[in-house]
Each structure stands twice: as C-alpha cells, then as structure tokens.
A protein has these predicted regions:
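Iron-associated oxidoreductase/ferritin-like identity signal
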Residues: 1-74
C-alpha cells in the first residue's frame, strides 16, 4: 500500500526484506560451513576441508554482493 506521495506504508520494502532474508541465510550458511570444516579436520580429510572452505568463501562473496545491492535499495 502506498500513500499519496507514492511511498509505502510498510517499514521496509519487499525487496529490502528479500535482500535481508538472503543475507541472513548466507550468514547462517557460513556458520554451518565452519562446523563442516571442523568436522572434516577432525577426521583429517583435507579434500573435504578444502571443499567446505571453497563453498564457505563463495557464500561470503555472495553475501557481500547481496549487501551491496541492499545498500543500493535502502
């Protein structure tokens, strides 16, 4: 719903909410990968450690991109 001046009466736009939700999910994924890396280290599986580190880094990079877009729409 919008007011007469075209502004939404919602505290944040749907797009802002979407970006915040994605950013939260990326942060949770990074935290999960930390656990997965630890598990792989405990059984001395270097290939698994490296894979989880690569996936974790990808999540971080995606989170940074999402954050940039969120700043643009706020």
């Amino acid at each position: 719903m919008t007011t007469g001046n075209g502004q939404s009466q919602q505290p944040i736009s749907n797009l802002e909410y979407d970006f915040i939700t994605v950013l939260h999910n990326k942060a949770e994924a990074v935290k999960a990968y930390d656990c997965y890396i630890k598990d792989a280290q405990e059984i001395n599986s270097q290939p698994c450690v490296e894979l989880f580190q690569k996936l974790r880094q990808s999540e971080i990079e995606q989170a940074q991109e999402v954050r940039h877009h969120l700043q643009q729409v706020m």
